[in-house]
Structure formats: structure tokens, C-alpha cells
């Protein structure tokens, strides 16, 4: 089965990588005679990446580009790629070539065999700082528990059949999590391993702050489980109150003086902290609902090439 392959490459401030990435992918696709298009999605970058994408589009007839009016985030860039892709199937990959393009050939062959989702699974996480690795492992352990999907070595490097692309695009939620949703939808799926390569140039745009924000957003957008923390905390506070109440009654019956300015203050501080945490969790979900009902687009395209 032959079919057009759309290679979607979200990009943000990675102008130095565009030429090499385009050349490498074009050479591999040409060598293996795979009908393809490359779709760069510029996520409102501040460097000269859009000029480089336009130049690559003029140099290579199969290279296209989409330019956002501002930065909307990687998830929105992936959604835009799925929207503008013309292929019978698509591959989503990073611009820095840490997702080895040669693996696309293997993924395409598996699609030809009838698989509708081909997931590239990390054999290792490559070179990362200790805190980055710890946070990533913690996040994926949590999301795996919440979704009952093994996300420990998952990546955005995936091939999707056109029908899977359409299913994802029909999900109208504003805050989507592509890595989890593309597994959650099901379909005939297989996996291939890959080793994370070193970046060709530049540095990762993910800071500790952005990773934490990304983790919280995706956990709350994909699962309501954190809301159960509020209920659990309520039961814990009730249990503590009952224990202290019984203790106070016993002391009163025994004629023991009830002590306790320090105890009262500590209990108030503890209960207030729990209440504030619970309100924060509820508030985050309310903010998510607010984002959904505003009905704003997930991205705005200012230019195409």
C-alpha cells in the first residue's frame, strides 16, 4: 500500500536546525522512495526560523510551512500539523533530530502492513540533567497511573493513520495531551524502540519551570484524579478531628485539663494549609473549564508557505 506521508515538525526558536533537518529528512525519504511532504510548524518563534522555513520550501518542493501569530505551545503546534497535513498518514517528530529520521522508514513500512498507530518508544532518555530526568520520570509515573497507559518511555515520535488523525482533530478540548491521547484512542498499534540522539545544535527550550507547568497542565487536562485529593483530604481532616474530639472527651472525663493554645494553633495552620491546597486544585480545574468555554482557537496561523 502506497500513500502520502506527512512529516510534522513543530519548531520553536530552532532556526539553526531547519536547513539540516530538512536536508536529512529529504535525503532519507528520497533514498527509500517514500511519497512525502515535510510540514514545519513555527510556534511563534522569536528568531529567523520562518525565513529559513520559507527558504527550505523554495529549495525543496515537498517542504511546507505554517507560521503562528504568536507562541501557542507544542501541543497546539502538533494540532496545527495534523490540521494542515495532506497525507494518508503522518509522523510527528522533533526538529532537533533527537528523533532519528531513519526510523520513519520502519514506521512507514509497518503502516503499509496495516498498523494504524506506530509508537517510537525510548530505549533511554539521552543526555539530560539529573533534575530533568527525575521530574520526567515522576511525571510519567503519575500519568501512567492516572490513565492506565504505560507512558514511562513514551514520546511524541509517532506515526498515525489518517483515520486516527481525524479522530484526534474531532476532540475539541483546548488543552489536549497528544502523547497520551494518541495512545488512548486505541486502533491497531505497534511499537518500535529508538535511542534519543544528541541535539544537532542549540539547547533545549524546556526549563524546569516550563516542565512543571507542562506536567500540571497535562495531568489536569487528561484526568480528574487530582480532584479526588480534595475528597481524601476532607476525610483525613475529619478523621483527625474525630481523634482529637475523642481525646478531649476522655481527658475531660478523667478530670485532666485540656491544654492547648499551641495545639489549637497548629491544628488551625494544618487545616488552613489543606484547605488552601484543595482550593488551588479546584481552582485549576475551574480555570481549565474557563479556557474551554471561552471557545478561543488552539492556534492562529498568520502565514503559510
Residue ranges and their predicted role:
Residues 6, 35-37, 62-64, 116:
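Structural signature of beta-strand start/N-cap positions in the alpha/beta core
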Residues 1-27, 33-34:
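N-proximal low-complexity "stem/linker" segments adjacent to membrane-targeting elements
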Residues 42-51, 97-98:
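A conserved acidic beta->alpha catalytic loop
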Amino acid at each position: 500500500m502506497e500513500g502520502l506521508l506527512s512529516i510534522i515538525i513543530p519548531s520553536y526558536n530552532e532556526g539553526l536546525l531547519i536547513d539540516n533537518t530538512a536536508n536529512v529528512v529529504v535525503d532519507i525519504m528520497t533514498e527509500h522512495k517514500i511519497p512525502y511532504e515535510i510540514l514545519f510548524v513555527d510556534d511563534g518563534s522569536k528568531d529567523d526560523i520562518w525565513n529559513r522555513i520559507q527558504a527550505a520550501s523554495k529549495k525543496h518542493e515537498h517542504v511546507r510551512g505554517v507560521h503562528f501569530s504568536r507562541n501557542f505551545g507544542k501541543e497546539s503546534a502538533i494540532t496545527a500539523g495534523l490540521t494542515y497535513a495532506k497525507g494518508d498518514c503522518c509522523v510527528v517528530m522533533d526538529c532537533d533530530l533527537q528523533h532519528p529520521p531513519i526510523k520513519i522508514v520502519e514506521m512507514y513500512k509497518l503502516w503499509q502492513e496495516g498498523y494504524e498507530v506506530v509508537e517510537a518508544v525510548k530505549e533511554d532518555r539521552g543526555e539530560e540533567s539529573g533534575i530533568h530526568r527525575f521530574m520526567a520520570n515522576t511525571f510519567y509515573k503519575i500519568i501512567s497511573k492516572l490513565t492506565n497507559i504505560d507512558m514511562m518511555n513514551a514520546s511524541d515520535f509517532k506515526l498515525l493513520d489518517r483515520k486516527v488523525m481525524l479522530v484526534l482533530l474531532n476532540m475539541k478540548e483546548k488543552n489536549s495531551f497528544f502523547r497520551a491521547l494518541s495512545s488512548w484512542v486505541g486502533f491497531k498499534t505497534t511499537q518500535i524502540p529508538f535511542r534519543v540522539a544528541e541535539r544537532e545544535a542549540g539547547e533545549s527550550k524546556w526549563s524546569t519551570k516550563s516542565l512543571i507547568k507542562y506536567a500540571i497542565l497535562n495531568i489536569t487536562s487528561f484526568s480528574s484524579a487530582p480532584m479526588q485529593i480534595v475528597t481524601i483530604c476532607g476525610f483525613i481532616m475529619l478523621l483527625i478531628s474525630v481523634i482529637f474530639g475523642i481525646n478531649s472527651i476522655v481527658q475531660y472525663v478523667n478530670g485532666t485539663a485540656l491544654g492547648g493554645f499551641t495545639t489549637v494553633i497548629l491544628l488551625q495552620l494544618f487545616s488552613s494549609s489543606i484547605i488552601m491546597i484543595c482550593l488551588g486544585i479546584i481552582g485549576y480545574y475551574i480555570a481549565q473549564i474557563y479556557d474551554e468555554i471561552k471557545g478561543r482557537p488552539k492556534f492562529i496561523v498568520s502565514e503559510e508557505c
